[in-house]
């Protein structure tokens, strides 16, 4: 049985690529045709790639691999947070900060600072500080929660990164390459399939397309860990 059906992908608009002038020729094998100046992705190829990606991710989850979801564009941010949380993965959905992976020791210290501030806030310790100092601490807390909140349970580097919009998250791709972390990536027609390990050719701009693909990958993680699609927890 297919992980995603052609009708599901059509309804989600997963077949719409970018304008033909913006394409990457390396994506040619995944393109069905051009229509009104826009490339149309071959959804038969997408279905095959999605089946392969589902099996790959499920196997990785079954063997205990840890996942990081990355998608910072507006139409992906909410989906990334919801689906990563549902399968117990970590996530970045606001902005990729340079060195998030390659300078992990520093990033880990910032995450610990976030946890300390959260404990101070919940215990009332911040409220007991002078008004100006409390305001500074709360601004720091808000900033850390915004950018690092999805990484609070990530105790070490991820084993797999799931990526939306390769062009936008290019710095994340480079850090993964440097650290030999495999990347599962949605690939629109302007992307480079050589920069990922597990390609999924599809529209990475439409919310419904992102929801469909990322939701199925979250299902694969839960199935690999628990034999079902119920919520998981990486711990």
UniProtKB/Swiss-Prot annotation:
Keyword Ribonucleoprotein attributed: yes
Coiled coil feature spans: none
Molecular function per GO: structural constituent of ribosome
Domain of life: Bacteria
CDD domains cross-referenced by the UniProt entry: RPS2
A Pfam family per the record: Ribosomal_S2
An example Gene Ontology biological process: translation
An annotated GO cellular component: cytosolic small ribosomal subunit
Key words, A-Z: Ribonucleoprotein, Ribosomal protein
Family matches, as Gene3D superfamilies: Glucose-6-phosphate isomerase like protein, domain 1, Helix hairpin bin
Family the UniProt entry places it in: Belongs to the universal ribosomal protein uS2 family.
Protein name as it appears in the record: Small ribosomal subunit protein uS2
Species: Synechococcus sp. (strain RCC307)
UniProt gene name: rpsB
């Amino acid at each position: 049985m297919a992980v995603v059906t052609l009708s599901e992908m059509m309804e989600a608009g997963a077949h719409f690529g970018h304008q033909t002038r913006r394409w990457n020729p390396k994506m040619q094998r995944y393109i069905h045709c051009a229509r009104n100046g826009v490339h149309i992705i071959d959804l038969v190829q997408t279905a095959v790639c999605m089946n392969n990606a589902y099996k790959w991710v499920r196997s990785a989850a079954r063997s205990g691999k840890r996942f990081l979801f990355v998608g910072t564009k507006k139409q992906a941010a909410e989906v990334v947070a919801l689906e990563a949380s549902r399968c117990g993965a970590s996530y970045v959905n606001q902005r990729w900060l340079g060195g998030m992976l390659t300078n992990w020791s520093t990033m880990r210290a910032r995450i610990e600072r976030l946890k300390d501030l959260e404990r101070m806030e919940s215990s009332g310790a911040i409220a007991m500080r002078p008004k100006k100092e409390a305001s500074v601490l709360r601004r720091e807390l808000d900033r850390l929660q915004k950018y690092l909140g999805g990484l609070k349970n990530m105790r070490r580097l991820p084993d797999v990164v799931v990526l939306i919009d390769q062009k936008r998250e290019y710095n994340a791709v480079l850090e993964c390459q440097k650290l030999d972390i495999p990347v599962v990536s949605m690939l629109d027609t302007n992307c480079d399939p050589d920069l990922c390990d597990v390609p999924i050719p599809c529209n990475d701009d439409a919310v419904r397309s992102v929801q469909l693909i990322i939701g199925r990958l979250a299902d694969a993680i839960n199935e690999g860990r628990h034999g079902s699609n119920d919520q998981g927890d990486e711990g």
